[in-house]
Amino acid sequence: MALHSPQYIFGDFSPDEFNQFFVTPRSSVELPPYSGTVLCGTQAVDKLPDGQEYQRIEFGVDEVIEPSDTLPRTPSYSISSTLNPQAPEFILGCTASKITPDGITKEASYGSIDCQYPGSALALDGSSNVEAEVLENDGVSGGLGQRERKKKKKRPPGYYSYLKDGGDDSISTEALVNGHANSAVPNSVSAEDAEFMGDMPPSVTPRTCNSPQNSTDSVSDIVPDSPFPGALGSDTRTAGQPEGGPGADFGQSCFPAEAGRDTLSRTAGAQPCVGTDTTENLGVANGQILESSGEGTATNGVELHTTESIDLDPTKPESASPPADGTGSASGTLPVSQPKSWASLFHDSKPSSSSPVAYVETKYSPPAISPLVSEKQVEVKEGLVPVSEDPVAIKIAELLENVTLIHKPVSLQPRGLINKGNWCYINATLQALVACPPMYHLMKFIPLYSKVQRPCTSTPMIDSFVRLMNEFTNMPVPPKPRQALGDKIVRDIRPGAAFEPTYIYRLLTVNKSSLSEKGRQEDAEEYLGFILNGLHEEMLNLKKLLSPSNEKLTISNGPKNHSVNEEEQEEQGEGSEDEWEQVGPRNKTSVTRQADFVQTPITGIFGGHIRSVVYQQSSKESATLQPFFTLQLDIQSDKIRTVQDALESLVARESVQGYTTKTKQEVEISRRVTLEKLPPVLVLHLKRFVYEKTGGCQKLIKNIEYPVDLEISKELLSPGVKNKNFKCHRTYRLFAVVYHHGNSATGGHYTTDVFQIGLNGWLRIDDQTVKVINQYQVVKPTAERTAYLLYYRRVDLL
């Protein structure tokens, strides 16, 4: 090539054609070196490896083919340009010699219509008559001159696939039948191509430049030696045909059976597959990414066969083609050997025993109902269902019926919670619950089900908190203490990656909580009650599956019924079923009313009882037992400075004046509250938000001292249980504190301090920030934050 370098005449190209066909890899041409006679076109080889009928010639101007002595120099070469089929004078010195089809062999002909050999690209049924018709209609080298005289522009190979990205001449999205666009669409098929396709028998499925051979969306490209067989029946319908075939029902059968098969990878913007009578929306179906299934015939009518290993030809370059649809495909995670469209399943070549083979069924069969549904179908089925319609509910109910609460502390690796909204009151509460050992062990005891295993649920709150607890794992390595200033020992801790518990936030809307209302004050104590009551109610519903008789007992059950309607108590009378006469100290009798309590694991952790006794002259004492999850402590009085003061104020006797009975007589009554049952986990609520008569709300900024070790004195207990509780049953230890920051009752921020057993110290968690603090910082009063919720555990359960 040093003596006579070939010259290139590119002809008249538009700017977009120049950019598309000369800048991209598809616009390159490689030529053999000059050796006295300019050789153009392709070369026929009689015997090719692996039984191929033709030899693939690669083009690229940046490559030079080494001269070969075995290169035959016969005048039967025809000119075929992949750059511009209208230019037979593309290479200087190469003239378009008109050679009749009888003078050449089918291996030596290179059709400009499909950029491939007609003998191998079109003869799907192996008919030599079809090959003759193809050669006659194509005209081979003579066809170039005819098209030049017609002055009708023939688009080069891959023109329409490049226009998928945009352009004025781009066609609308439609189905491709084996790579062909519908001839009714303008600019899709020229008049000559329509005439050429019309002369072909129905069994022949030609390829066009729109279905390139060297493309990653073709199975036969990735495995060059193992393409699909081409024997298509006359009654076969392809994926792109509008009706009467499996392609029309692609939406109903696009996903194969789940058992024994690989799930189908979908595009990033996967749309629901819907059968239609037009070809306008079927382009998306053709753009669906498919995997080769491990079994026989898939439900869409395409039978795929795969082998254990596929040998790729390293000598043949692979060129990536643009995705078939505009949504973009998630092909980054797919293996290279997967077809990307339905049209790629029908690319023709000679079959081989070591490659995926696709067969198209010739008879239409009704689509099978696939157990694997699409994502949008799953979303339709998601939601709350009754426990009777939830097959997993009975399994959870049996587990909870026999559960044993474990109070053993566990060392968990702390993780912050990302707050992208006003979720600090939720995050602070969640961190305190994670630090509660019996709560953690309970949720870890319940299995974690995926959406596939349980698309519909009757226990959304249980599911969410089981998932939350599974986000936390044991501390990997105990942190080593390091020496700091003085004799202090500071421990380092490595928290895990922060995450956003969006599934917890969605519970507010799923259960239609008032906390989800916009413009409403977010309150950590109210959210804690929402969680505990919700978990309790779901567990009650599960108990109904095992004991339907408990259904009538859940009407007044739960800590929600704090207030006592005294008029209703009088209307019930002394003969009510939920009251009895109880003899107290000094032989005093009292009528006790109690709601029907049904125990759940939640009440076994947080549930306590208070006794409210009403004293009235000339009448028996009237007592009512009420359950609670959080003990409400009034701190408004100036005399209350500590938690002990607030507890004593809770049990103090208060008088009520002006009470009128049914006889319209004014009598004096008094009321006293005592603790009937203490829970294993005692949550104290310091009532800092006081509602005024005008409707406003103010925050009490006063500091309330709270100890790390809290002892409940006997004077706080009910008379009947004073002597039944030992000191260890009345002593609690602090393990979590929820703080409220700010001076306003309608705003502010929430943080949490939790005790970490592995660290044997305290952590301060502010959303996703986690840092180590000492115990003094937990109980020390500060102006910027005030304690709002105090979490205590019984010391005998530590």
Swiss-Prot record:
Record field: compositional bias (Acidic residues): 566-581
PROSITE patterns: USP_1 (PS00972), USP_2 (PS00973), USP_3 (PS50235)
EC number, UniProt record: 3.4.19.12
Segments for region (Disordered): 139-166, 194-257, 307-337, 551-594
Reported impact of G11A: Decreased but not abolished interaction with G3BP1
Regulation: Specifically inhibited by spautin-1 (specific and potent autophagy inhibitor-1), a derivative of MBCQ that binds to USP10 and inhibits deubiquitinase activity. Regulated by PIK3C3/VPS34-containing complexes.
Modified residues (N-acetylalanine): A2
Primary gene name: USP10
Chain positions found as Phosphothreonine: T24, T42, T100
Function summary: Hydrolase that can remove conjugated ubiquitin from target proteins such as p53/TP53, RPS2/us5, RPS3/us3, RPS10/eS10, BECN1, SNX3 and CFTR. Acts as an essential regulator of p53/TP53 stability: in unstressed cells, specifically deubiquitinates p53/TP53 in the cytoplasm, leading to counteract MDM2 action and stabilize p53/TP53. Following DNA damage, translocates to the nucleus and deubiquitinates p53/TP53, leading to regulate the p53/TP53-dependent DNA damage response.
UniProt modification remark: Phosphorylated by ATM following DNA damage, leading to stabilization and translocation it to the nucleus.
Record protein name field: Ubiquitin carboxyl-terminal hydrolase 10
Assembly information from the UniProt record: Found in a deubiquitination complex with TANK, USP10 and ZC3H12A; this complex inhibits genotoxic stress- or interleukin-1-beta (IL1B)-mediated NF-kappa-B activation by promoting IKBKG or TRAF6 deubiquitination. Interacts with IKBKG; this interaction increases in response to DNA damage. Interacts with TANK; this interaction increases in response to DNA damage. Interacts with TRAF6; this interaction increases in response to DNA damage. Interacts with ZC3H12A; this interaction increases in response to DNA damage.
UniProt-annotated stretches for the region Interaction with p53/TP53: 2-100
UniProt-listed Gene3D superfamilies: Cysteine proteinases
Outcome after substituting F13 to A/G/P/W/D/E/R/H/K/S/T/C/M/N/Q: Abolished interaction with G3BP1
Effect of F10 to A/G/P/W/D/E/R/H/K/S/T/C/M/N/Q: Abolished interaction with G3BP1 and ability to inhibit stress granule formation
Annotated stretches, region: G3BP1-binding: 6-21
